[in-house]
């Protein structure tokens, strides 16, 4: 009888351990940041075109601007587009970064670790945040001195 009871509790324990491992899998399934070159940083200013809140990471898409507030164009006359990946939507919303707070037309400055493959996309660099400067480029550009800093990333 003792053997059957021990065996039963052993099976229950193994099932509980398996369930605990399965519950931890979503966190372990998180993607790698190896696609970003964390040895390089680019500070970019642009006009927000789209804010995409996502369960895993929110993305902000913007048209690159020069220091005078003019949207930069590529050789085909189209706006030079960039994107930045931030933290989870729930986390950044708790820090004031929401679709409502960052509507299209908002001028922002971000520092990113760019993709290694050269495409115009990056992840928000550690020790930086998103600088929001309204809808008109401030004199001297969109900087921490002329705008409001949101979502400062830890070092």
Region annotations inferred by a language model:
Residues 30-45:
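Short N-terminal segments immediately surrounding and downstream of signal-peptide cleavage
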Residues 94-110:
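Short nucleic-acid-contacting surface segments enriched for D/E, G, S/T with interspersed K/R
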Residues 2-17:
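Bacterial N-terminal signal peptides that target proteins for export
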Residues 115-149:
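OB-fold/S1-family single-stranded nucleic acid-binding modules
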Residues 54-67:
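Short aromatic-glycine-enriched beta-strand elements
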Residues 25-29:
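Sec/Tat signal peptide C-region and signal peptidase I cleavage site
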Residues 76-89:
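Short, basic/aromatic beta-hairpin or loop at an interaction surface
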Residues 46-48, 107:
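Conserved hydrophobic positions within beta-strands
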